[in-house]
């Protein structure tokens, strides 16, 4: 029937550690999508989120409150949040009843920031799996603060966390380096930006760590971690400045390709636009180079000097 609501829905599960910019991303992405003409519903799955800057279509706080759980069960913030997710998992009928009237919208799920929820705890994964049974196609959008690139040890840690998340969540996955406009506020990058976004030869990071007296004692451990990351060869990043429309568009292009939205029937596209969405997301070098020129200070001389020191 022409007036029937579409059976398949699409959306993004926005995940990442605390402070990575998930809520700000949901606000910026929702505004961008509405400007494109998409009907958007933002769903807050974080019971600790207060003072939300966006219009919330569904709020898990209506089902269970973190403060109430902490008081009643004498749990801390982390334990209370895990309980809230387990409670939501046990009451998915409530969530489905809230989402069903929004069928035909594009969903943005603002998820909690506790890392363990995406690396080894099962509740969030089970919730996403159940959504797939409701014919809701999600892409996991994993945000990581870009300033971690300025510290080789932290960047290796980020790579391990990103890999563990990709393997555990079991969704089409897009990793983002958020807050690109602030990337060098904590220090200069040792290499060009594409080294970090494409996760190139990580042995160079090991050489940088070896120059640090503290990390030199853990070289074998770091070598094994790097080997694990390179053996899987799954992790890469897209740089994002949520204030930059071109940057948001590149992210959306990758997300649409990952969950199949660009090939759906909800949004009419010309053949040229379809091919652009299908192929263009695979080639990030030119866009990454543009972002580097925009947000990073010229460092050719510094790079040469550091290369001489290796």
Swiss-Prot record:
This is GPN-loop GTPase 2. InterPro entries: Gpn, Gpn2, P-loop_NTPase. A motif (Gly-Pro-Asn (GPN)-loop) lies at residues 76-78. It comes from the Eukaryota. Small GTPase required for proper localization of RNA polymerase II and III (RNAPII and RNAPIII). May act at an RNAP assembly step prior to nuclear import. Disulfide bonds: none annotated. The keyword Acetylation applies. Signal peptide: none annotated.
């Amino acid at each position: 029937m022409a007036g029937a609501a579409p059976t398949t829905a699409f959306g993004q599960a926005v995940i990442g550690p605390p402070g990575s910019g998930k809520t700000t991303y949901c606000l910026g992405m929702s505004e961008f999508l509405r400007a494109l003409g998409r009907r958007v519903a933002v769903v807050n799955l974080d019971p600790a989120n207060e003072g939300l800057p966006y219009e919330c279509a569904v709020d898990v706080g209506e089902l269970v409150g973190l403060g109430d759980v902490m008081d009643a069960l004498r749990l801390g913030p982390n334990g209370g949040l895990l309980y809230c997710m387990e409670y939501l998992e046990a009451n998915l009928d409530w969530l489905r009843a809230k989402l069903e009237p929004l069928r035909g919208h594009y969903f943005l799920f603002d998820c909690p920031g506790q890392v363990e929820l995406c690396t080894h705890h099962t509740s969030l994964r089970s919730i996403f799996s159940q959504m797939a049974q409701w014919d809701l196609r999600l892409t996991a959008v994993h945000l990581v603060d870009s300033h971690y690139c300025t510290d080789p040890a932290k960047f290796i840690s980020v790579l391990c966390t990103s890999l563990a998340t990709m393997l555990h969540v079991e969704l089409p996955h897009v990793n983002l380096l958020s807050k690109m406009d602030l990337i060098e506020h904590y220090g200069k990058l040792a290499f060009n930006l594409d080294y970090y976004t494409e996760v190139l030869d990580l042995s160079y990071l090991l050489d940088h760590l070896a120059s640090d007296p503290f990390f030199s004692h853990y070289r074998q451990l770091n070598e094994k971690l790097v080997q694990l990351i390179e053996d899987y060869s799954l992790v890469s990043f897209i740089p994002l400045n949520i204030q930059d429309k071109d940057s948001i568009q590149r992210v959306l292009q990758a997300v649409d390709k990952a969950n199949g939205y660009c090939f759906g029937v909800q949004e009419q596209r010309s053949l040229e636009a379809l091919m652009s969405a299908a192929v263009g997301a695979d080639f990030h070098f030119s866009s990454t180079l543009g972002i580097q020129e925009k947000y990073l200070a010229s460092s050719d001389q510094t790079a040469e000097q550091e290369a001489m020191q290796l």
